[in-house]
């Protein structure tokens, strides 16, 4: 039996096939995502969700064989994508490199006001809320890899692992919830999210 691993990075997307018993690397595929898109300001570091998902799906599908038992997905932390109630991305991916949190906010910056760092999901969301930039049909935000898993499994609402939630900032690990607004479902530990092509 074999396992597939997908890593959605900032500049590239990688897929591997590993033998579950031996740990042997059977196959590896890496593609540049070339997903950065122009924003309105120089500090914006945003990417095309559609392009990322297309490449990640192509890599995944190219690795599937009859003896694949499980698929694991990971990716860049901190960055966020807004999703509507039907599970569709309604924004670009705001990457961890996005600099909106360093913009002035009163006598400080957006990031410093939250005691956080620019590029963290909570800072990006705070800036967007304060500046009317959250898409009107956005219901949730999540990482790009949580969004990819939701698409693969046919979920309308992404599930976020608490380690990714913690990487956004302003997440209480004890109560497993955000401090403030966010209507997100969290998962703890290692769990099967769902199925893709009967895997």
Language-model-detected regions and their locations in the chain:
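Short, Lys/Arg-enriched, disordered terminal segments
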Residues: 1-2, 107-109
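N-terminal glycine/serine-rich phosphate-binding loop of ATP-dependent small-molecule kinases
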Residues: 1-91, 137
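Gly/Ser/Thr-rich active-site cleft segment
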Residues: 8-10, 111-199
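Short, charged, surface-exposed secondary-structure boundary motifs
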Residues: 38-40, 103-107, 170, 198-199
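Short glycine/proline- and acidic residue-enriched helix-loop micro-motifs
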Residues: 41-45, 109-115
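Surface "functional belts" at beta-alpha junctions
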Residues: 94
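Carbohydrate-associated surface elements
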Residues: 98
């Amino acid at each position: 039996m074999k396992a597939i691993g997908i890593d959605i990075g900032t500049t590239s997307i990688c897929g591997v096939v590993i033998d579950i018993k031996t740990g042997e690397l059977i196959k590896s595929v890496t593609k540049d995502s070339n997903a950065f898109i122009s924003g309105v300001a120089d500090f914006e570091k945003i990417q095309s969700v559609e392009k990322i998902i297309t490449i990640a799906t192509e890599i995944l599908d190219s690795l599937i064989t009859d003896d694949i038992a499980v698929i694991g997905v990971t990716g860049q932390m901190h960055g966020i994508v807004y999703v509507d109630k039907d599970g569709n991305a309604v924004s670009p991916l705001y990457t961890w490199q996005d600099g909106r949190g360093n913009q002035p906010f009163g006598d400080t910056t957006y990031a410093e006001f939250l005691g956080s760092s620019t590029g963290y999901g909570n800072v990006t969301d705070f800036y967007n809320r304060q500046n009317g930039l959250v898409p009107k049909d956005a219901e949730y935000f999540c990482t790009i890899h949580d969004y990819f898993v939701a698409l693969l499994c046919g979920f309308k609402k992404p599930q976020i692992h608490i380690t990714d939630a913690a990487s956004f900032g302003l997440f209480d690990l004890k109560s497993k919830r955000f401090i403030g607004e966010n209507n997100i479902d969290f998962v703890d530990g290692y769990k099967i999210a769902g199925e893709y092509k009967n895997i």
